[in-house]
A protein has these predicted regions:
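Short, surface-exposed recognition loops and adjoining beta-strand edges that mediate ligand/DNA contacts
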Residues: 11-22, 105-113, 156-245, 362
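Conserved, well-structured interaction surfaces
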Residues: 33-103, 130-134, 151, 312-317, ...
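Inward-facing hydrophobic residues that define packing positions of alpha-helical scaffold repeats
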Residues: 61-64, 68, 137, 144, ...
Length: 422
């Protein structure tokens, strides 16, 4: 599947468009970017951008369905068919879920019978009908739960030359990534107990562990985090995209972080938040210094020493990481088990070099929001978080806010989707 293409997770749903919608990134003078950050969904250029995402995602969903329809695979000698099928089902659910998050109202703030999207379950030229938002989620959960049943516990870093498909499990939607996706979906649906159960399974039953604070630098720099990535996409050329959009400031599409981003990080307090220097650097351009989001810049490519990169590192894009599981638990337990919620919150903080929240201090939604912002800046998740919580979005220049509404949170479904039905 070409999930790494620029219209999807190679750019628009990771570091570019979706981060512009979150007001995390901006590009002064670029009309396309400025229309996006003003949520001008009636403009043809923005509608074309949304259609770009829509059609690309469904093309990839079709690829997953092609795998699921390939009966010959079942007869292949020594081929791990149940794993293959489980991953394809999980990918189908993962991609539909992101389309739902983009193109439909938030589940918890609308009626279940609100119109959703077409859920494509067959490899066919026939376009499936639109269905209700409730049915969308029913389909997503059905695919994920069947994937959970099919997938077996797999080592993450084992290499077996006889079955290459089973290598590099982080770049596959493995069992632990299915659990993580289920936690994400259930939280979006407001099903807190189920979200906690799956997030806890990832934390307690998977081999993933939070990296130490001294490991933060470079851990996401064009590679999948060895310790924290539940699922990511292999993408050998991600550096060229990151270099043009994030590292440089000479390209007409180059993105600047929001004006006040550093105020979110506790730079002036001790102990130090290790993410600050790991995620951002300053460059000089025209006699001025500018911050760049260097979180994903491959330091081996940047320094022309790609041959020195440790062989076990997987080049690519991180789509689901372990800290989110702690944040899901902390938020979902905030009212019912505040002690456990604080413990989850503190676990990530201390692994990023910060002090734990004292027992006498109450953990609040605002503190959780702040911590999520700092951890996931640039990773394409902040817009979805604002939407799920029905929060206003502070503008990139910190001068105003955009009130929460479907006008900003629901992208326009392409007109071509209605025109091509038969």
């Amino acid at each position: 599947a070409q999930m790494r293409q620029s219209s999807l997770y190679g750019s628009e749903l990771s570091i570019r468009g979706i981060e512009v919608l979150a007001q995390n990134m901006t590009c002064p003078g670029n009309d396309d970017i400025e229309m996006l950050q003003r949520y001008e969904y009636d403009k043809s250029d923005v509608q074309s951008w949304a259609e770009y995402i829509w059609t690309s995602m469904y093309a990839n969903i079709s690829n997953a369905n092609s795998v699921l329809s390939a009966d010959l695979v079942k007869q292949a000698k020594d081929f791990p068919y149940t794993t293959y099928k489980g991953e394809a089902l999980a990918l189908r659910a993962f991609m539909h879920f992101d389309l739902v998050r983009l193109f439909t109202p938030q589940y918890t703030t609308t009626q279940p019978q609100t119109t959703g999207i077409p859920y494509q379950t067959e490899f066919s030229l026939k376009t499936p009908d639109f269905e209700s938002l409730q049915k969308n989620y029913d389909h997503i959960l059905a695919d994920l739960l069947e994937a959970e049943r099919l997938l077996k516990v797999q080592p993450i870093h084992d290499y077996d030359a006889s079955t290459a498909f089973m290598n590099d499990r982080q770049s596959h939607l493995n069992l632990y990534a299915v659990w993580g996706t289920l936690a994400r979906v259930y939280q979006t649906m407001g099903e807190k107990e189920k979200a906690v159960a799956y997030a806890d399974s990832v934390i307690t039953k998977s081999p993933y562990r939070l990296k130490e604070k001294t490991e933060v630098v470079g851990d996401l720099a064009g590679v999948l985090s060895e310790k924290e990535t539940l699922f990511g996409i292999y993408y050998a050329d991600f550096y060229s995209t990151v270099s043009e959009l994030l590292q440089k400031r000479t390209f007409y599409q180059s993105l600047d972080p929001r004006s006040d981003f550093m105020l979110y990080y506790e730079r002036e307090s001790l102990p130090l938040d290790y993410r600050t220097s790991a995620y951002f650097t300053q460059i000089e351009a025209g006699g001025q210094y500018f911050y760049r989001l260097s979180k994903f810049t491959d330091i081996y490519e940047l320094n022309n020493i790609a041959g020195s990169r440790p062989s076990q590192l997987i080049l690519g894009i991180n789509l689901l990481r372990l800290p989110e599981m702690y944040y899901i638990m902390a938020e979902c337990l905030l009212e019912t088990d505040p002690v456990r919620a604080r413990a989850c919150y503190n676990e990530v903080r201390t692994h990023r070099g910060l002090s734990a929240l004292p027992e006498e201090s109450a953990l609040t939604q605002d503190l959780l929001d702040l911590e999520f912002f700092k951890e996931y800046f640039g990773e394409g998740q902040q817009f979805f978080r604002y939407k799920r919580l029905n929060q206003p979005i502070p503008s990139h220049d910190a001068k105003t806010t955009y009130p929460a509404s479907s006008k900003i949170y629901v992208l326009p479904i392409p007109n071509s989707e209605y025109a091509n039905r038969y």
